[in-house]
Amino acid sequence: MFRKFQYGLVLVAMLSLGIVAMSCSGDDEAETTTAAPAAKAAPAAAPAAKAAAPAAKAAAPKVVETSKTTKAATADDQAAGLGEGDVSWPSLSDKMPSSFSESPICAAQAAAGTIPALEDRLPENPLVIQPAESIGEYGGTWYRGFTGPADGQNMERPMKDHLLFFGTNMTDVQANIGESWTSNADATEFTITLRKGLKWSDGDDFTTADIMFWVDNMMADEDLNPAPPAWAKSGGELLKFTALSDEVIQINSKEPYGLLITLIASVVVAGPHTRGDGGDGLYAPSHYLKQFHPNFVDGGVAAANAAAEAAGYDNWAKYFLFKNHANANPESPMMTAWKVTQPITSEQWALERNCFYYAVDTEGQQLPYMDYVVLDLAENLEVLNLKAIAGEYTVQGRHIDLSKLAVFKENSDKGNYRIQFWRQPESGIANLYINEDWGRGPNGEPELASFLTNADFRAALSMGTERDEINEVFFLGLGEVGGLCAGWDDPNNPGKYIGEDFVQFNPDAANALLDSLGLDKKDSDGMRLMPSGAKLVVTHSVAVAAFEDYEGINGMVIEQWRQNLGIDGKLDAQERSLWSGRIDSMEAQLNSWESSGRAGAIITPGHLGVVDASGFIARQSAIDHSNGIYAEGWMGEWQRLYDEAVSDGDAYAGNLQRVVELNCENVNPITTVMNKPTYTAIIKKNVHNIPNPLPFSYHSQTSGNGFPETWWLEGGNQ
């Protein structure tokens, strides 16, 4: 057989742009939409006039001080690709400011008695953030664009409501809502200590009771959470949570769980703003939600259901999940820098500063610097990009079309913006994910399934793909042709040249391989027939209006396979939620999406893994794995390596390399273009403190790892 792997030293030509650029990335999973109340909210009114900013303060030095929980940014600048003149990274500071101050908006509310004084709103030990470039001034509005109720990640990413979070480098776990954590030597017992005196955005206390409410009344409730999240299990048993005090939560696992703290910092766990619409998120505003939960409502389930039906919902669980979804329900208290004032179901999704936010800068100014965030609904991506070209947005990377780069450059002075490329190491754009469990789905057909699960067949498809054409037509030639294991500049790269024969255009070898698989017969149109005589047709399922032109890219691949291989194809283009539904039900044979970098292969395994029930490659096998059943062949090896990495922190790095090698060796996904700009960020010229470039990943929720609460507008909105 042709499937032999060559190993060797390979020099990879990198882009000579001074930086490595990237595009508009997708999210790891399709988002669900929570039903809105019957009456649609009116568009948000324009924010109030900006309060006068305090006198400008001297810019802080660009050398970012070292903290206990993060490396000094300057030590990592070169590794991150930061060049001379680039903004350094933000970091946490151990030095508590001698005094604290607040925005004029919060000061006015405190003076009017509508909120407590600042000292009663901040925790005893606030999170202290050293901005990347300079101490900022208060005021202004962050204008953005969004595409509708399924675009929740548009603001979930910058708001990072996780108990712990990552540094800008995307690897170092650091404090956030929680100020510290511990683990025993066996990695079976953990504690997380919250900041004392934390407040929700409505002023109520945030304590471990909010974690235990989620554990006991949400995760454990089958109506809200029929299947507890995979991260909350160890050795087939749920983790045990114990509140040791108002500030200290203890977590015990049946087996060693060395990856748990990293997962808590990542989007996998996150908080209710990110995960609340699905009943997940590790904590929840118990003081608010108890009024909708039958465990706390007089009359129990019957009364809770009656209240839900009166509000237009089928049952209490659906109503409860809506109430816990802050993007759709502005009443829901939040722990983020800004709080929602106008829901995501409106034509204008609006937020305002949270005067109870727990973070300050190194001079004691309560964050965030900007007062408001206003996102205008764009009817489609073309409209959103036209608004960005015209300079209507303050900072916008999401949904920006790289193919319009020349137009953006031409209009940058007129629109008063600059352009940054935020980089995601080892990112695959428009990968082709073959569903190895399609034969187990509702439309599965054994003969075709036998080819989809055959790595030689996938290798032939890969070698029949003309990647250079895809790169030039859709990505301006800014991407690179290669696979996941090509030796790219990535700290998690296996360091071997694995499976790269399969990403080189080689139609002769591909056709010989297909012939050897019994696909040597063709119809009158030159399309290959399966041994039964039925024509082999591969259906490509794609989401429309979702980050990349998946419809166009896959249409090109289908035509390439027809011409180069005699493999017929069909394009199934659906709105994103419908596309996601087809994947969930295992109806899709092949779907196209990005991969969020090698670093996320184990932390967020939905792209490359076979252990996530919402993943792309083998959903049913992932469900089996959650029940202790391993798949056969390479997928079973992937699952065992994953399990070992989760339990044993020392095995993590080596296993991370090996699992991606398995993807490369078995040609799933089939990569098309690698390492293109992930976010082409359009940024007003007077915005400060945005790292350049900002390392990008899904698991660290970029732009959240750039600490947007420290971004500020010199001279206000322009």
Kindly give the residue locations of the regions a language model identified:
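Hydrophobic helical h-region of N-terminal Sec-dependent signal peptides
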Residues: 10-18
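Outer-membrane beta-barrel and related beta-rich outer-membrane complex signature
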Residues: 484-488, 684-686
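Extracytoplasmic/periplasmic ligand-capture domains
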Residues: 24-96, 106-108, 166-169, 182-183, ...
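Surface-exposed binding/hinge segments that line
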Residues: 230-317, 690-693
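Bacterial N-terminal signal peptides that target proteins for export
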Residues: 2-10
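A structural "hinge/loop" feature
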Residues: 133-157, 177, 260-269, 442-448, ...
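N-terminal lobe/hinge region of extracytoplasmic solute-binding protein
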Residues: 101-102, 107-185, 216
